[in-house]
């Protein structure tokens, strides 16, 4: 039967086939008092009226603001070629390539993505992606639980509070012990983290740069964790990885990231991209798709889904994860973006972003009562302590067309006067100067 609106005759045939008299009989298991009496749907509109309605709604959005928001999601420039190439029909509509002989192009693209992120993070293995940075971090934690057969996880409070909320939600019924180690003025408390990692710990979970923008070397912490047979799990910012010490250099066992900053536009929370990488001993624990490269009997290169004993291929209880899909299109966009930039271009993107952040920090801290939250090095994002409420500053400047940053007090009690400011290569020095002048005018 074609997928078109069914005629009364079609409906009658289908109802007869399944042995019911009316469509309402299909919902007999739902009590009558719980069924909607009416959906109160408005009268249908013509195509022209629908367009007018949507245009009127979209006109309410403010597109003329200059935003210094970050907090894990960044407005980097995306070359137009990313949209042009990723919107090709063979990529845009393709699903999981179960038949490798018919999907070599898709499989090769995923393989190249895996290779690119492994090189970027200096790790051994990667999967084809998961949903976003938060789900990637949860899956990393579960990898550690399976690999170590332990249930205690030590989490740095300087880890993104968005991720920490997701972890608490995802693990609420898993009988895991989540130990959160408080930060110190936006910095990781290394002594407290080490003290919390013992022989019952599955993993220590950190972020670099952390939520407050601080850059940290976790090499000693991961060495300490390894001495207790625990794993080191780190969440990173892909663009900054081009200029920072990599997870591999620090000795991390699992490294994850949200790939939004490479090829994905800011879009009300998604779709984004969860990047997952690990060391070779953990490759059988990593969830999702993995594409491998091999040779056929004639010596020709071929790409296939490999190590498939993970989700729908085996019993649910034996699977590494319930994630049966991935963000292959977003992964492709990230691959195209990385390829267009090249190593030098990615480094330049990071350097330009850091350059503007340094200038912004200098201008803002020159204002009376404004000081950096910490003295640790930072990349393209930093936190400042204001003499007034950060919420008030955000409200007043946003009304004038400049979003000055993120009010940290939204997630951290007692930090209502702390503002998190992020810069990318898209910000001009002039815009930074205007921000400083506007902030100075209300302090």
From Swiss-Prot:
GO-annotated molecular function: glycine dehydrogenase (decarboxylating) activity
Protein's name according to its UniProt entry: Probable glycine dehydrogenase (decarboxylating) subunit 1
Keyword Oxidoreductase appears in the UniProt entry: yes
GO biological-process terms attached to the record: glycine decarboxylation via glycine cleavage system; nucleoside metabolic process
Upper classification of the organism: Bacteria, Pseudomonadati, Thermodesulfobacteriota, Desulfovibrionia, Desulfovibrionales
InterPro entries: GcvPA (IPR023010), GDC-P_N (IPR049315), GDC_P (IPR020581), PyrdxlP-dep_Trfase (IPR015424), PyrdxlP-dep_Trfase_major (IPR015421), PyrdxlP-dep_Trfase_small (IPR015422)
EC number: 1.4.4.2
Free-text function comment from the UniProt entry: The glycine cleavage system catalyzes the degradation of glycine. The P protein binds the alpha-amino group of glycine through its pyridoxal phosphate cofactor; CO(2) is released and the remaining methylamine moiety is then transferred to the lipoamide cofactor of the H protein.
Protein family according to the UniProt entry: Belongs to the GcvP family. N-terminal subunit subfamily.
UniProt keyword DNA repair present: no
